[in-house]
Amino acid sequence: MTKEFHHVTVLLHETIDMLDVKPDGIYVDATLGGAGHSEYLLSKLSEKGHLYAFDQDQNAIDNAQKRLAPYIEKGMVTFIKDNFRHLQARLREAGVQEIDGICYDLGVSSPQLDQRERGFSYKKDAPLDMRMNQDASLTAYEVVNNYDYHDLVRIFFKYGEDKFSKQIARKIEQAREVKPIETTTELAEIIKLVKPAKELKKKGHPAKQIFQAIRIEVNDELGAADESIQQAMDMLALDGRISVITFHSLEDRLTKQLFKEASTVEVPKGLPFIPDDLKPKMELVSRKPILPSAEELEANNRSHSAKLRVARKIHK
């Protein structure tokens, strides 16, 4: 049975308006999720325009088919059930050589967090899962119970930036010697045991960073985003745009770096002009990230950490 997707779209108008949508253009929503961005983008297209929507979660696609039904009936939407790291290959299969714009809403979606059985949330007791693609083999259970101490420390530091990574990895090792760690609640309690009292008093759940680290590892989120954003920039038509929403510093740093590399060039001294093959292919539409408005922050608590970066194709 299809579960309802209750998802408040973050930075909805900013993300799509910054794409400067051409009514007859070809667009991609790389992270379909609750279909809010897709629906708003489609409202700006004529019947000659087309949207390709990616998601590796069948539940998201099932719900989007209902929400976007009027546009589907007009033949304006193609759903692609796959990880967006395969963006270029899947679009080529569909006969698409270039696109006029693409948007990303990175990270886990609100419905995935809210569905207890998906095992993403430290606030709800559930089996350790955290797979965005439920057909994938690697789960949070595998990471927590089978990764050795050094691998746990590596991902906790790298993806969670938690200063207690070593102590938490050691405590996990000790706990699983007694019995496997099977649920989100068990893991959260182990993490709490490690954190000093002053850390537990801080705003935010003490397990947040470790859960983020495990989720990123399970889904290879940063690796997939890196590959996909580079493919997207390659596929953009001249004057095409890319919008990327991030929710934590790792995603934002990655996006900022990819945009910087594509929009700057190191020209050897003494060259009278910049050769075509050295010209930057992108330019930043906004130098600083776009943040949610005060009204959105008040209405949607999950928008607090959101940042939007936008770039435009200026050279093929």
UniProtKB/Swiss-Prot annotation:
Gene3D superfamilies: Putative methyltransferase TM0872, insert domain, Vaccinia Virus protein VP39. One of its GO terms (cellular component) is cytoplasm. Its EC number is 2.1.1.199. InterPro entries: RsmH, SAM-dep_MeTrfase_MraW_recog, SAM-dependent_MTases_sf. GO terms for biological process: rRNA base methylation. It comes from the Bacteria. Coiled coil: none annotated. It catalyses: cytidine(1402) in 16S rRNA + S-adenosyl-L-methionine = N(4)-methylcytidine(1402) in 16S rRNA + S-adenosyl-L-homocysteine + H(+). One of its GO terms (molecular function) is rRNA (cytosine-N4-)-methyltransferase activity. It is found in: Cytoplasm. S-adenosyl-L-methionine binds at residues 35-37, 55, 84, 105, 112. The keyword Kinase does not apply. Keywords: Cytoplasm, Methyltransferase, rRNA processing, S-adenosyl-L-methionine, Transferase. Specifically methylates the N4 position of cytidine in position 1402 (C1402) of 16S rRNA. Belongs to the methyltransferase superfamily. RsmH family. NCBIfam families: 16S rRNA (cytosine(1402)-N(4))-methyltransferase RsmH (TIGR00006). HAMAP family: 16SrRNA_methyltr_H. PANTHER family: 12S RRNA N4-METHYLCYTIDINE METHYLTRANSFERASE, S-ADENOSYL-METHYLTRANSFERASE MRAW. This is Ribosomal RNA small subunit methyltransferase H. It comes from Streptococcus pneumoniae (strain 70585). The gene is rsmH.
